[in-house]
Amino acid sequence: MSTGKVVKITQAVVDLKFEDGLPKIFNALKSKLKYKGKELVLEVSQHIGDNIVRCIAMDSTDGMSRGDEFVDTGAPISVPVGRSTLGRIFNVVGELIDECGPLKGKYDLEPIHRSPPSFTEQKIQEEVLVTGIKVIDLLAPYLKGGKIGLFGGAGVGKTVLIMELINNIAKAHKGFSVFAGVGERTREGNDLYNEMITSNVIDINEHEKSQAVLVYGQMNEPPGARARVALTALTMAEYFRDHENQDVLFFVDNIFRFTQAGSEISALLGRIPSAVGYQPTLATDMGAMQERIASTTAGSITSVQAIYVPADDLTDPAPATTFSHLDATTVLSRQIAEMGIYPAVDPLDSTSQSLSAEIIGEEHYNVASEVKRILQTYKSLQDIIAILGMDELSDEDKIIVDRARKIQKFLSQPFHVAEVFTGMSGKFVSLSDTISSFKGIIEGKYDHLPEAAFYMVGSISEAIEKAESIKAEVGAGH
């Protein structure tokens, strides 16, 4: 294999000169020396003439100097795939970082850059994925084999929601789950790992009994690692789909950091930025990854992606580019979070392609449509209420406002993963309970119950119990 020498280092971007044969684009180069006790991997990104290639480093370039030698491996970054990866934590280049010893059993190595499945291989599923979260199951249901996006600004609950989805779906799910931590907090990665051990999704004593693989490239990593770690995780998920014929759950937190890392690299590579300083290849980079997340005749990949929205602006190029790839969008709103309603999902902004009578059934569709109509009417009446007060509304509008406020409160729900913060036990609500509960509210069956009874409960039976305890407290007070 040919050897190149470092001629220039610019943070995460390194130029190397090869005298005997240039490595191909996307090839991995390995260092002859060790930096901080381990080999450094570079990925070839550009050929810039005079036998010089420009590469992206997958780890810190601290300690590197001009003249250091790197060897062309002759292939892209290749990572372990297969059942022996279950229960383990990997980094971007497929090295184990959980300190639980080497991989046991057989495994293959697969390159992280691949083509998406062809048209003839792809398959559409029309089966709803029940999450146990009322607002999602009722108003923006997820499809098995679909792509789901959780949009939200800083601190509105994206990671808590994705962890609850992992808790609710991965536990009940018989297949495998792959989690990609892309440029997020290391503490959250550690919390998730411990949560998975507690809930038996990962068995640290017998890894082969685990149901999940974790791949981390966190905030402290250089942009090369953050830009490629989602592809590493996706390669592992694709193997389970194609070779094990599994229905795989693929979680990404956070897809915005993938774009952000691409933007950092793009600037270091000397490309002219496009709108809002993003890389000119934003749509291409996103498309190349998203098209690989597909369901085929062999198996399916259902992906749930958290998407940070800079400055709460959904028209920012990064979230806007991601929107076009998704089947369902769950939008988290700061206004709803400020009202103390968690999960802070905006019921009117969130969308789903599966919200049609053919897929979810006539009753579910009618209840969801009526709930949205009531909430929309309440939203349009809020200006009148703010200026003139409730007394100026017609009797019909007063009933709508009353029901809308109950619906709003009832869309809140205590989460299993947030029990330590809320002090309330988490609730998983079945789809039939969700539909019948909301049907009762819109038909006026629960108009006599106080608004507070609907807040932070699971099914309607809990709201009725809460109403009785409120009544008893008020009675005792008198």
UniProtKB/Swiss-Prot annotation:
Family annotation (Gene3D superfamilies): 2.40.10.170, Bovine Mitochondrial F1-atpase, Atp Synthase Beta Chain, Chain D, domain 3 (1.10.1140.10), P-loop containing nucleotide triphosphate hydrolases (3.40.50.300)
Listed name of the protein: ATP synthase subunit beta
Organismal lineage: Bacteria, Pseudomonadati, Pseudomonadota, Alphaproteobacteria, Rickettsiales
GO cellular component, one term: proton-transporting ATP synthase complex
InterPro entries listed in its UniProt record: AAA+_ATPase, ATP-synt_VA_C, ATP_synth_F1_bsu, ATPase_a/bsu_AS, ATPase_alpha/beta_chains, ATPase_F1/V1/A1_a/bsu_N, ATPase_F1/V1/A1_a/bsu_N_sf, ATPase_F1/V1/A1_a/bsu_nucl-bd
UniProt entry keywords in alphabetical sequence: ATP synthesis, ATP-binding, Cell membrane, CF(1), Hydrogen ion transport, Ion transport, Membrane, Nucleotide-binding, Translocase, Transport
Originating species: Wolbachia pipientis subsp. Culex pipiens (strain wPip)
Membrane topology: Peripheral membrane protein
Matching CDD domains: ATP-synt_F1_beta_C, ATP-synt_F1_beta_N, F1-ATPase_beta_CD
Catalytic activity: ATP + H2O + 4 H(+)(in) = ADP + phosphate + 5 H(+)(out)
